[in-house]
Amino acid sequence: MKRMKNIRLGTLVACMCVLWGCEKPNVNIVMPQEASNRVLFAGEHLKKALEDAGYSSVMLSDTAGMDKDEVCIRLEQAADTAGLKKEGFTISTRGNMTTVTGNDGSGVIYGCRELIDHVGQYKDLKFPAQLTDAPEMVLRGGCVGCLLYTS
């Protein structure tokens, strides 16, 4: 009887260790304090999607005090837009730091959508080391349909 109790206790401890080790990391979403409404929207949309996927996340205005091992996603608009088309974005990842740089606020939104799609498809935070994308046509989604029907 005592042996059976020890086996149950050992199994319980092993299960707790496995579950504790499987905890998803906290994700810090960092954006400038003076971020535009579109960048704020992108950050909130990303935060909700991460939480829906089981991650805890927090929105910050800088990386001060963050541990270098914490996962961080930085959202920003490009200061120099020469390399990006309108509504374009670049995602770059080094270690635990992923930066989404949009040519404009819409580019940041589309970059965050790319991250959200990645989390949904791959169930992880291993984002591409480098990805740049921009639309062929600036108008996307429902706007194109509206233009077709209002002409």
Feature roles, as predicted:
Residues 24-39, 70-76:
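Short hydrophobic beta-strand segments
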Residues 2-11:
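Bacterial N-terminal signal peptides that target proteins for export
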Residues 43-62:
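N-terminal segment of the mature soluble domain
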Residues 26, 34, 42-45, 49, ...:
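Feature activates predominantly on carbohydrate-active enzymes
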Residues 58-84:
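Short, well-ordered secondary-structure micro-motifs within conserved domains or adaptor modules
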Residues 20-21:
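C-terminal motif of bacterial Sec signal peptides marking the signal peptidase cleavage site
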